[in-house]
Curated annotation (Swiss-Prot):
One Pfam family, short name: Adhesin_P1_C
Native source organism of the sequence: Mycoplasma pneumoniae (strain ATCC 29342 / M129 / Subtype 1) (Mycoplasmoides pneumoniae)
Chain intervals for the UniProt region annotation (Disordered): 1-60, 355-413
Transmembrane regions: none
UniProt feature, compositional bias: Polar residues: 1-13, 25-54, 355-376
Biased composition (Gly residues): 385-399
Name this protein carries in UniProt: Putative adhesin P1-like protein MPN_144
Family: Belongs to the adhesin P1 family.
Length: 413
């Protein structure tokens, strides 16, 4: 039970992952494999702290080659989703909108005050409270660091740092501890991975055998019939920021991101655009931060704001990433209900099926030949978690055929 470090399949390395040996400078790595007799090809990661031990072959280790390996799925999702904090903020006037002190992180924090339920109030994943937080801004963007909330043109997007609100949106980690139980409709198809996260469908492409750490990320609105639902590419070259993953002593996968490459792309774009002037140097490097390319497709969302005197203002040039653009609403209550409907698990599943053109199918047509990582049907983790398995028949907690226990408890087989 308590053995660790003696076996290659300990909690710290449940998949017997090969590891790199890192020099003290952090930039000279050679592959090591205790069972290997031949020379292994070196895997090079730059800018890694010397005390980190990344996997020598992270794409292979986290590629779901064995699609029924729940431990591997957990490692990947914990490492990936653990670095994506998102915030859901309520709309309203200054006196009615959520302040930082109002942001509740769990259902128990809310006590009986449902009006401050600003996280899972807008959506659950397979019946579980969704700990995601996605900060929302309405109407005016974050120009000058003080955008106002209106309910006439709502949109969900990433927060722009106060100190650099004219450049890009960033997510600073570590965020909430995402687990596979928070994710639905997880499927692997060819060289891509897709899963449902709240009201979004997140897809990772070309990650099975990426080139030098390539990781293509894209976020799509679930309503494919709505012209306002646009695909968003997370950073122009996300692989320029990735520096490697490793398994820590608790059995969790952690990742290092260096934003200099992404910043360079955005600085180049900024130099070519008259509406943006900030460079990446305005943001301090953070080993676990992930920058996002500014979206400029919603031109109408960046129209000049109008002051109380009626004169136009051209200060509304701050970049603002639209993830989901709900229908126009006229009141806070209507917006709240719209967001609840948008992120409702049943709505999400319906829209997923619609987006793949199979309204009456239990699984998207293009995914019918794939095998979801959890369970044997269309990825409804709720029944698996309850012990019913994919078919929902059995009642024992071990009957689902998939081990969903935390990674820390992996015993080595």
């Amino acid at each position: 039970m308590g053995q660790q470090g003696q076996s290659g399949t300990s909690a710290g390395n449940p998949d017997s992952l090969k590891q790199d040996k890192i020099s003290k400078s952090g930039d000279s790595l050679t592959t090591q494999d205790g069972n290997a007799t031949g020379q292994q090809e070196a895997t090079n990661y730059t800018n890694l702290p010397p005390n980190l031990t990344p996997t020598a072959d992270w794409p292979n280790a986290l590629s779901f080659t064995n699609k029924n390996n729940a431990h591997r799925a957990q490692l990947f999702l914990r490492g990936l989703l653990g670095s994506i904090p998102v915030l859901v903020n309520r709309s309203g006037s200054d006196s009615n909108k959520f302040q930082a002190t109002d942001q509740k992180w769990s259902y128990t924090d809310l006590q009986s005050d449902q009006t401050k339920l600003n996280l899972p109030a807008y959506g659950e994943v397979n019946g579980l409270l969704n700990p995601a937080l996605v900060e929302t801004y309405f109407g005016n963007t974050r120009a000058g660091g003080s955008g106002s909330n209106t309910t006439s043109s709502p949109g969900i997007g990433f927060k722009i740092p106060e100190q650099n609100n004219d450049s890009k949106a960033t997510l600073i980690t570590p965020g909430l501890a995402w687990t596979p139980q928070d994710v639905g409709n997880l499927v692997v198809s060819g060289t891509s991975l897709s899963f449902q996260l709240g009201g979004w469908l997140v897809s990772f492409t070309d990650f099975i055998k990426p080139r030098a750490g390539y990781l293509g990320l894209q976020l799509s609105g679930l309503d494919a019939s709505d012209s306002d639902q646009r695909e968003l590419i997370w950073a122009k070259r996300p692989w320029a920021a990735f520096r490697g993953s490793w398994v820590n002593r608790l059995g969790r996968v952690e990742s290092v991101w260096d934003l200099k490459g992404v910043w360079a792309d955005q600085a180049q774009l900024a130099a070519q655009a008259a509406t943006s002037e900030a460079s990446g140097s305005a943001l301090a490097p953070h080993p676990n931060a992930l920058a996002f390319q500014v979206s400029v497709v919603e031109a109408s969302a960046y129209s000049s704001s109008t002051s109380s005197s009626g004169s136009g203002s051209s200060s509304n040039t701050s970049p603002y990433l639209h993830l989901i653009k709900p229908k126009k609403v006229e009141s806070t209550t209507q917006l709240d209900q719209g967001l609840k409907n948008l992120l409702d698990p049943n709505q999400v599943r319906t829209k997923l099926r619609q987006s793949f053109g199979t309204d009456h199918s239990t699984q998207p047509q293009s995914l019918k030949t794939t095998t979801p990582v959890f369970g044997t049907s269309s990825g409804n983790i709720g029944s698996v978690l309850s012990g019913g398995g994919a078919g929902g028949g059995s009642s024992g907690s071990g009957q689902s055929g998939v081990d969903l226990s935390p990674v820390e408890r992996v015993s080595g087989h």
